[in-house]
Amino acid sequence: MARLPTTELRKYLLTGQFTRRGCLHLRPSPLAPPIPPLRTLSTTPPTPSDQQPQIIPLRKQLKDQAKAAKLSGSPKKKLKKSDNQTVPGWDLTVGIEIHAQLNTPSKLFSPASTPSSSSDDAVHHHHPNTHVAPFDLAIPGSQPSFQPTTLIPAIRAALALNCHIEPISRFDRKHYFHWDQPSGYQITQYYHPFARSGSVTLYPRDGIAAEDGEQVTVGIKQLQMEQDTAKTLAQPNSTHYLDFNRVGVPLVEIITEPCIHRPATAAAFVRKVQMLLKSVDACTSGLEQGGLRADVNVSVKRTGEEELGTRTEIKNLSSFKAVEDAIIAERDRQIRVLEEGGRIEGETRGWSLGSMETRRLRGKEGEVDYRYMPDPDLGPVVIGGDLVERLGETMGMLPDEEVGVLMGRFGLSERDAMALMLMEGRLEYFYGVLEELERMLGVEAVEGGEQRHAMLAANWCLHELGKLAEAEEVGEAAAEEVTSQVPEQDLAAILFYLHQKKVTAKVAKDLLWDVFRGTIATGGVTEQIDSQDLWYKEITEADYAAIADEVIEGQEKVLQDFLKFKQGKSKAYPQGKLGFLVGKMMRAGPEQGKGMDPASAERVMRVRIEQVYLPRLEDAQ
């Protein structure tokens, strides 16, 4: 390791400043070539090669291996989700540990900034080993300095999970050796956590298993603050790169009671916790973005037995589906072992995307192996009741209350309300669009009813924007940031003109695409409609009738269905046939329906059929 210059050490000790280069990244010259993450560990000597092997991300390697395994195996009938929730004669018990990165500007025990708080990393690309301080790297002589601001999101998280906040908590050292923890121990709150005895209630809309009924309450044993570890980047030839930016980032560990008995309910719990933490701005990002990591403890026992079975732990599950699938796979493995007369060993297991079974990682370490002890360098954390009360008052609505508002006040379906809640940033975007739309509508927003405008805005925020993200010509990055490419004011302007019937639905969708592609500048929707003459000019009633007559000509067989209904020979009105004729009518109109209103077209078509063509058919009989 390069020696740390005394000038840099003095700056850090006296002013808390640390240079961007970091203490492991001292380059001799600004012209030096880029250097990969600097601590490289290899279990085998490198093989000389004229050509550097292509580096394939580990996640892609695992996906490719899983696909190959599926293709090589025999095809199996796909089970319904409900078929996998229970196994007759066996009881499943699951406990969950969730590690969530707290939304803080600094690390837990050093003034170094967290990667997520850095203003120059707006697109979430961070130079390796730049968000570090001497304590993060366990440099001799460096001491931990608890950063009080990290308490704020931690307390919010505990309140959102209905926990009791302990007035005094303490930090402990959890000893183990691994390359991602340079100090040889992790600082956590094993003996005296800052929050205990919480609960989360789940409902069918959260995705619980049908067997769990109308609601499930999951008990929270405790919440504890602790340090995150370095990020390990696996490379070919048993080589690992280490990025220490993540070391010391504050985490809150959420530990449940072993009270979950269905795989789908376990996944629903993790999803609900993510919603709760994000609603109070406690965590940086969600499970699939790496801000949360879930470990599950799985055990099975025969129905009727009192004592729980031996549990195994599955580490680092990175999606809600992975939580459910891994639990199902491990449950089935344990049942198979027990039915064959074997015994379950307490161990840590892993799970890969697309895999059909878990794999052994290592034997389970007991608490004695970690040698927990109070940290002598850190005093107790005292949390005042006034702070807890203040944070509770300013916390805002929690997800269940928010869903109630979306359904009751705005008239949204439960499905749409939950979709807005679950999609990253979509709920805030919806509120922004609705506020701008009602501003443009003015007094009409009150007279016309808030629900109608909210339902229109929600439909476009979910479904029409969803179509943009799913389109083949849209790249993955664009799909993830679709709301950032369609400003709230532009979508509100499109919906305003659509609501006022000044543009057709087809024109509105075309305008949305133009905004998304960037061919319309921000705030330029009205100018685009003017320049392209896209304003809706409805044709006359006589023109509607003439087009309807043109479409009906030669459709005697279709008209017979309407006649049968009129004569009582058919009980159901042929709405599908009416829609077929209206569709032909819209296509036969000027410029593919421009100037035609579908509702007016349907009304005229119905009148022409009932008042003109059916009497002719009856006379002909």
From Swiss-Prot:
Extent of Low complexity compositional bias: 38-57, 110-120
Stretches the record annotates as Disordered: 26-86, 106-136
Reactions it catalyzes: L-glutamyl-tRNA(Gln) + L-glutamine + ATP + H2O = L-glutaminyl-tRNA(Gln) + L-glutamate + ADP + phosphate + H(+)
Any Pfam family matching the protein: GatB_N
Subcellular localization(s) per the UniProt record: Mitochondrion
Any GO MF annotation of the entry: ATP binding
UniProt entry tagged with the keyword Protease: no
Keywords: ATP-binding, Ligase, Mitochondrion, Nucleotide-binding, Protein biosynthesis, Transit peptide
Enzyme Commission identifier(s): 6.3.5.-
One GO-annotated biological process of the protein: mitochondrial translation
Transit peptide interval: 1-41
Top class in the EC scheme: ligase
Record InterPro entries: Asn/Gln-tRNA_amidoTrfase_suB/E, Asn/Gln-tRNA_Trfase_suB/E_cat, Asn/Gln_amidotransferase, Asn/Gln_tRNA_amidoTrase-B-like, GatB, Gln-tRNA_amidoTrfase_suB_CS, Gln_synth/guanido_kin_cat_dom
Top-rank taxon, per record: Eukaryota
Cellular-component GO terms for this entry: glutamyl-tRNA(Gln) amidotransferase complex; mitochondrion
PANTHER family per record: GLUTAMYL-TRNA GLN AMIDOTRANSFERASE SUBUNIT B MITOCHONDRIAL AND PROKARYOTIC PET112-RELATED, GLUTAMYL-TRNA(GLN) AMIDOTRANSFERASE SUBUNIT B, MITOCHONDRIAL
Family listed: Belongs to the GatB/GatE family. GatB subfamily.
General function of this protein: Allows the formation of correctly charged Gln-tRNA(Gln) through the transamidation of misacylated Glu-tRNA(Gln) in the mitochondria. The reaction takes place in the presence of glutamine and ATP through an activated gamma-phospho-Glu-tRNA(Gln).
Self-association state and partner proteins as the record states: Subunit of the heterotrimeric GatCAB amidotransferase (AdT) complex, composed of A, B and C subunits.
NCBIfam families cross-referenced by the UniProt entry: gatB (TIGR00133), PRK05477.1-2 (NF004012)
Name of this protein: Glutamyl-tRNA(Gln) amidotransferase subunit B, mitochondrial
Source species of the chain: Podospora anserina (strain S / ATCC MYA-4624 / DSM 980 / FGSC 10383) (Pleurage anserina)
